[in-house]
Amino acid sequence: HQEVYPVLTPMAVDSSRPFPLIRNKSLNIAALLQNDKTGDEYEFATVQVPSVLPRLVRIPSKHEKDITFILLEQIIEKNIDKLFLNYKVVCASPYRVMRNADLTIEEDEAADLLTEIEKQIRKRQWGEAIRLEVEDGIKDRLLNYLVDNLGIGNEDIFNISGPLDLTFLMKMYGIEGFDNLRNKPFKPQPVV
């Protein structure tokens, strides 16, 4: 709580706050909220999983040899109700948006090609949404809200059974005490 809570930025969507721009390849938690006062209105909210914290969180154990991890997004999802006071969290689920990263540079029209390339690279984070990864079992109402607001077709939705964005697994490779599970380094034969 002390490490994660201060770096979270929950964003709720309502009539005065439009659907936020979701950064390319960022991991987020979507939530459907019910107002405690009205009881019948549903609101959408999203929280980006902070990249400044490690995605794998080691859970302390009584036994030194027992090593257990939990994913940061699971911690956030299970405690998301603490971010939205006066709301009941109806459902929550992780998602990730992939955006079009193509560069469209008119070389003939660009006065300064380097400046134009830099500008286009900055825009890549906010291109058109072309893929939506969601955790298998996401509630239909939550999925439909994401699809409608991102402008994604059904063929661009990928239900993932397991964690989204597996790049974090490389961090597990360096964990001490598991040398027997690692492949031996490959040594190429010298050139004769």
Language model regions located:
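N-terminal localization/anchoring segments of enzymes in phospholipid and broader phosphate metabolism
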Residues: 1-192
